[in-house]
């Protein structure tokens, strides 16, 4: 929630939440309503975190085109069936990422995975980047992403 709203937005949401509900017995829906109202955002899909059991799994596929200096990142999400929930709706997964290259270090950005599969294209990437994903543990997920030992050393 913090990553989606930012510190200031999260604070606004908390202030509104306490203004409305201080001393009351409330629900997760009350909390989300305060966050949504304070920030003017639709958090309907975010409710899946509260209503669906299990931990989402995100599969990472990357492709670098040296000729066009373009990097494509495809993320696919799934969540295993649980008793009473065979079918799962896509989660709203906020993922902080950074592309690290020898030439430059791209700015950290927030990608919002809301569909079963989404692709992002990054232009003007001079070298094959090393992907740093789920920075600061931006989402409580499992990640399927095989990285070379060299790439892992770059991340340290």
Region roles according to the model:
Residues 8, 15-156:
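Non-catalytic accessory/interaction domains
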């Amino acid at each position: 929630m913090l990553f989606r709203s930012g510190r200031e937005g999260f604070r606004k949401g908390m202030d509104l939440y306490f203004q409305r509900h201080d001393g009351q017995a409330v629900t997760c829906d009350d909390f989300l309503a305060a966050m949504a109202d304070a920030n003017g955002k639709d958090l309907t899909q975010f409710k899946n975190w509260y209503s669906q059991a299990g931990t989402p799994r995100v599969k990472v596929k990357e492709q670098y085109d040296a000729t066009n200096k373009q990097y494509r990142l495809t993320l696919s999400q799934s969540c295993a069936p649980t008793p009473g929930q065979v079918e799962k709706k896509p989660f709203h997964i906020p993922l902080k990422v950074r592309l690290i290259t020898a030439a430059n270090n791209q700015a950290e950005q927030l990608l919002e995975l809301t569909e079963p599969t989404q692709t992002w294209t990054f232009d003007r990437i001079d070298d094959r980047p090393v992907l740093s994903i789920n920075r600061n543990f931006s989402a409580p997920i499992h990640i399927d992403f095989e990285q070379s030992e060299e790439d892992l050393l770059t991340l340290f």
